[in-house]
Regions:
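Conserved class I S-adenosyl-L-methionine
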Residues: 65-75
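Conserved acidic residues
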Residues: 67, 155, 197
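Conserved SAM-binding loop of SAM-dependent methyltransferases across substrates and taxa
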Residues: 76-88
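Conserved SAM/SAH-binding beta-strand->alpha-helix loop
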Residues: 97-99
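Conserved SAM-binding motif I beta-strand of class I
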Residues: 90-95
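S-adenosyl-L-methionine
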Residues: 1-65, 101-148
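Class I S-adenosyl-L-methionine
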Residues: 158-270
């Protein structure tokens, strides 16, 4: 464990898995899916593995700038794990709650392959996801103490901010961590490809048009002129179940797309 004034690093290991197992055992949400350590509350809030995996499959590894994949509010780590294992990149998770951070680190360990050298650079930082300067320093220090001299940049940023519980609607500034400050804090640490940095935002599907416009304005303020694609994902029933924004290097040619998701794969894209 690497101590820092504002962050400390957890290096995924079998020891952390043992500690996590004392909190909650690893279970699969569905037959054939990976097992994860999650409390009931975490399981309720976590993105399903099938959706997380499909998102990773939509990204071409060659489109990503060089560097690690960062999840600045990682929670259980399911989406980050799907991205890092699918795209063969190291993962950096940041989680404010130390108890959740422990489970996230354990999940990174049990889903990784020992032969995959990328996994030796996986870390979970317990601390504030908006404090980019101290977070990246803590990450690099942890790598150095483990014998890795590299100072990898951030190749992709993922953010799924917490929203008010049981709220049918919420305001943009109620997201935690706050979207604007977080994007601004990490902007200078993101590697840039031909279409800009790679950022994936996972938002509430209940955002109305005005709220989506505020998100667009926040993105434009941080990354002027950057391309983005709004994705509306439905699992049936005539409703939108997931809303996300694919920014920069992972955007498509269209400003929006609708996806019909089956149990395990995309059924149609419009």
């Amino acid at each position: 464990m690497n101590e820092d004034p504002s962050h400390y690093a957890l290096n995924p290991s079998s020891d952390l898995v043992k500690r996590a197992s004392k909190v909650t055992k690893a279970e699969s949400a569905r037959k054939g899916e990976p097992k994860f350590h999650m409390t009931e509350d975490m399981r309720r809030l976590s993105t399903p593995w099938s959706i997380s995996r499909v998102r990773a499959e939509q990204i071409q590894a060659t489109d990503l700038p060089a560097g690690v994949i960062l999840d600045a509010a990682a929670g259980s780590g399911v989406q980050l794990i799907a991205l890092t294992t699918g795209l063969k990149r190291p993962g950096l998770a940041i989680e404010l709650d130390p108890n959740i951070g422990l489970l996230c680190a354990a999940n990174m360990q049990i889903t990784g392959e020992e032969s995959d050298l990328q996994r030796t650079m996986d870390r979970v930082l317990v601390g504030d996801g908006t404090d980019a300067e101290n977070a990246i320093t803590a990450y690099w220090n942890s790598l150095r103490e483990a014998g890795t001299r590299a100072h990898p940049p951030i190749g992709m940023l993922h953010l799924d901010p917490a929203r008010p519980r049981d709220a049918q609607r919420h305001e943009i500034d109620e997201m935690q961590p706050a979207l604007g400050p977080l994007l601004k804090a990490w902007a200078n640490h993101l590697e840039t490809g031909p279409r800009g940095p790679a950022v994936l935002l996972d938002l509430s599907p209940r955002l109305n048009e005005d709220q989506r416009s505020l998100v667009d304005a926040t993105i434009e303020t941080t990354f002027p002129g950057i391309p983005r694609t709004w994705e509306y994902l439905s699992q049936g029933g005539g409703r939108i179940d997931r809303l996300s924004v694919w920014i920069g290097s992972i955007s498509s040619k269209e400003p929006s797309r609708c996806i019909r998701m089956g149990k395990k794969k995309i059924m149609a894209t419009i």
